[in-house]
């Protein structure tokens, strides 16, 4: 997966609970073909998608990988935007079912490749292990919810010190300069994804996806999001109003509150937020949020802000450690399914399926 430059998450272990945008990675317009895989852990869903992605890349088809936020080494989805094809894992916690079965979506049932009798001796262990995995994810979610309160507190503190009018005027000038207006344009299409999130490894960010998607990137350096959120929100509205298709990359911790980045493919242009968790190795222009924020006023809350940042870091660490324990439990659960699978049949199916879809 290291050879693929474009990686996104379609789900996030956020401070608001698990947040899924799986249903926003395609349009039910009669042109997209969506294959939803159903099956248990360890049944080859990720390997199937990796095989498909590799073959698509061999044919020089633009291929987007969507790793799993609970295990970034595994895939949750593969998107071929130019061919309008999606393959995704439709199992919990990001359960996806067809809305337009046959016309748009089709289920790939991987239970067809396992031996039901192989589970007979392990039913109790499978249920207990599944429940333990769910309990650990709930514990991680509570750590994230607590962190969310502290992140929000710092955001509101910084927002109270931010000159909103000055920030908005800057955003307007920036958009007029970089985004050509279109007359009588229909609203553009928006694709919603993530490039970061909390995982068993800690916070992971695919910042390279943004810079690989655009020739020009405007980076807003803002640890609290008070100014960057105003700018990014305005960019989003302006681009959509002028008929540009955009990729909106939400904040993985508070997705209902923040949009972190906007990519406008038609213009080869991106606007990105740089903070404690997402860094860009780029010489691109940087806008520093402090020019819009009263540092004197913000300084009055420095102790609270410092405490919140330190406590958030500890809560994220605890959440990651808990997710790591959950992954170990999930790996054990996979073992029960692996020994029940007929991978030879699945491999043959993967080869035929891939040939049929790509040729």
Mark where each language-model region is.
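A detector of single, family-specific signature residues
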Residues: 1, 48, 149
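N-terminal pre-Walker A segment at the start of P-loop NTPase domains
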Residues: 1-26, 165, 169-209
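Conserved nucleotide-sensing/catalytic segment adjacent to the nucleotide-binding pocket
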Residues: 2-19, 54-118, 124-125, 236-317
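Charged, compositionally biased non-catalytic regions
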Residues: 21-32, 40
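Glycine-rich phosphate-binding P-loop
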Residues: 34-53, 200-239
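A cross-family "folded-core" feature that marks the main globular domain of proteins
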Residues: 37-38, 48-49, 56, 64-67, ...
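An accessory alpha-helical subdomain
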Residues: 125-177, 307, 311-353
């Amino acid at each position: 997966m290291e050879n693929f430059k474009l990686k996104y998450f379609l789900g996030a272990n956020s401070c608001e609970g698990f947040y899924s945008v799986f249903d926003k990675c395609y349009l039910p317009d009669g042109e997209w073909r969506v294959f939803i895989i159903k099956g248990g852990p360890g049944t080859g869903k990720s390997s199937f998608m990796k095989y498909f992605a590799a073959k698509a890349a061999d044919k020089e088809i633009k291929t987007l990988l969507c790793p799993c936020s609970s295990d970034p080494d595994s895939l949750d989805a593969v998107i071929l935007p130019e061919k309008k094809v999606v393959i995704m894992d439709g199992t919990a916690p990001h359960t996806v079912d067809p809305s337009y079965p046959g016309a748009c979506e089709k289920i790939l049932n991987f239970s067809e490749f396992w031996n039901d009798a192989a589970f007979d001796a392990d039913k109790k262990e499978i249920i207990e292990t599944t429940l333990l995995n769910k309990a650990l994810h709930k514990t991680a979610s509570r750590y994230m919810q607590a962190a969310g309160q502290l992140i929000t507190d710092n955001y509101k503190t910084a927002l109270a010190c931010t000159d909103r009018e000055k920030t908005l005027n800057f955003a307007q000038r920036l958009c007029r300069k970089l985004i050509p207006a279109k007359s009588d344009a229909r609203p553009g299409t928006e694709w919603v994804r993530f490039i970061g999130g909390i995982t068993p490894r800690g916070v992971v960010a695919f910042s390279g996806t943004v810079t690989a998607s655009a020739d020009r990137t405007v980076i807003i350096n803002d640890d609290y999001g008070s100014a960057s959120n105003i700018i990014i929100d305005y960019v989003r509205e302006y681009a959509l109003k002028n008929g540009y298709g955009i990729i909106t990359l939400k904040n993985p911790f508070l997705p209902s509150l923040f949009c972190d980045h906007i990519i406008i493919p038609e213009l080869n242009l991106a606007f990105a937020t740089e903070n404690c968790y997402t860094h860009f190795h780029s010489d691109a222009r940087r806008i520093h949020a402090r020019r819009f924020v009263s540092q004197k006023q913000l300084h009055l809350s420095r102790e609270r802000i410092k405490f919140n940042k330190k406590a958030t870091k500890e809560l994220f660490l605890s959440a990651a450690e808990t997710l790591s324990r959950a992954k170990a439990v999930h790996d054990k659960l996979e073992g029960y399914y692996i020994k029940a699978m007929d991978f030879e049949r699945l491999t043959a199916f993967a080869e035929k399926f891939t040939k049929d879809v790509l040729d």
